[in-house]
Amino acid sequence: MDQTPIADMKFETALAELEDIVASMEGGKLELEASIAAYKRGMELMKHCQNQLADAEAQIRVLENGQFKDVDRSTLEAQ
């Protein structure tokens, strides 16, 4: 299992690793400790992907309002 820092991953890379983790867990061949580690990594990847999707959605909302600028989630949450 890849241990690239999740914060450095692009959405597609994180999603692909998450899909691999799900497949290996569904296969039922992981030992208990490996399953727990895979579950933890998968949850971290899922959160990372959800955050990246939320950021993308926020940028789309800004573009739809005719405001062409970079935004981050903290800016939108303050509004």
From Swiss-Prot:
Positions the record marks as coiled coil are: none
Q: Quote one Gene Ontology molecular function term.
A: exodeoxyribonuclease VII activity
Q: Please give an example of a GO cellular component term from this record.
A: cytosol
Keyword Nuclease among UniProt keywords = yes
Statement: the UniProt record of this protein carries the keyword GTP-binding: no
Under the heading InterPro entries, the entry gives: Exonuc_VII_S (IPR003761), Exonuc_VII_ssu_sf (IPR037004)
EC number(s)?
Answer: 3.1.11.6
UniProtKB keywords: Cytoplasm, Exonuclease, Hydrolase, Nuclease
Compartments, as annotated in UniProt: Cytoplasm
One Pfam assignment = Exonuc_VII_S
Catalyzed reactions: Exonucleolytic cleavage in either 5'- to 3'- or 3'- to 5'-direction to yield nucleoside 5'-phosphates
Which BP terms in the Gene Ontology apply to this protein? DNA catabolic process
The similarity annotation says: Belongs to the XseB family.
Described by its record, this protein's role is as follows: Bidirectionally degrades single-stranded DNA into large acid-insoluble oligonucleotides, which are then degraded further into small acid-soluble oligonucleotides.
Q: How does it assemble?
A: Heterooligomer composed of large and small subunits.
The record's section on PANTHER family has:
EXODEOXYRIBONUCLEASE 7 SMALL SUBUNIT
Q: What is this protein called?
A: Exodeoxyribonuclease 7 small subunit
